[in-house]
Amino acid sequence: MTDLKASSLRALKLMDLTTLNDDDTDEKVIALCHQAKTPVGNTAAICIYPRFIPIARKTLKEQGTPEIRIATVTNFPHGNDDIDIALAETRAAIAYGADEVDVVFPYRALMAGNEQVGFDLVKACKEACAAANVLLKVIIETGELKDEALIRKASEISIKAGADFIKTSTGKVAVNATPESARIMMEVIRDMGVEKTVGFKPAGGVRTAEDAQKYLAIADELFGADWADARHYRFGASSLLASLLKALGHGDGKSASSY
């Protein structure tokens, strides 16, 4: 197996196969569930809006892949600093049956100098998630923070407040995941000594098998080859799947989506 094939198989099994579009429908989510079951293995999860969780749960069960996890998004994509709303949305997502919640950190508040609201928001959402055995991923929106010190600070605050994963991006802004921001975030995980309990998720802009290989190489360099499993590493993507399957000898690499 070539290096690209090996990394592509790894990446496929770490994917949060995503559709977060305004025109999402039950039919599109059902199709996403079907795509998550591939000839070479299942993706780790799907990521969808909360209202589609029941139909996704039903579809995953019917197709014999109930182990594929269901992730959803809250405080999304705006990252406002209203803790009550973020918490209400997170509780609603849990009630719908989410296995994982990806909440957007109030990044604009941090840029304006307020570190406390981000900590409090993540902590409140973490308490709700922990009570229901739901994983919490925190999206810090690196492409808007831009500054390395801010990316580092948002990562640190999220981890201190209880994040199970830190995630680069919503996929809804001009600049999403980059290898540079990924390295900064994973270095924070390393420097805080939390690599056993905190994972990393690049999202948006990871589109090709070669892209995925680059991101996995950073993780392997920092933590060793065994760290990037589904509890510690995910790719938030949709079009990536077709590229991975093509690298693995399945399909033509074409995809209908651009996340």
Curated annotation (Swiss-Prot):
Keywords: Acetylation, Cytoplasm, Lyase, Schiff base. GO terms for cellular component: cytosol; membrane. It catalyses: 2-deoxy-D-ribose 5-phosphate = D-glyceraldehyde 3-phosphate + acetaldehyde. One of its GO terms (molecular function) is deoxyribose-phosphate aldolase activity. InterPro entries: Aldolase_TIM, DeoC, DeoC/FbaB/LacD_aldolase, DeoC_typeII. SUPFAM superfamilies: Aldolase (SSF51569). Pathway: Carbohydrate degradation; 2-deoxy-D-ribose 1-phosphate degradation; D-glyceraldehyde 3-phosphate and acetaldehyde from 2-deoxy-alpha-D-ribose 1-phosphate: step 2/2. Its EC number is 4.1.2.4. The active site is at D102 (proton donor/acceptor), K167 (schiff-base intermediate with acetaldehyde), K201 (proton donor/acceptor). CDD domains: DeoC. Optimum pH is 7.5 for 2-deoxy-D-ribose 5-phosphate cleavage. It is found in: Cytoplasm. GO terms for biological process: 2-deoxyribose 1-phosphate catabolic process; carbohydrate catabolic process; deoxyribonucleotide catabolic process; DNA damage response; nucleobase-containing small molecule interconversion. It is an enzyme of class 4 (lyase). The keyword Protein transport does not apply. Monomer and homodimer. Catalyzes a reversible aldol reaction between acetaldehyde and D-glyceraldehyde 3-phosphate to generate 2-deoxy-D-ribose 5-phosphate. Can also catalyze the double aldol condensation of three acetaldehyde molecules, leading to the formation of 2,4,6-trideoxyhexose. This is Deoxyribose-phosphate aldolase. It comes from Escherichia coli (strain K12).
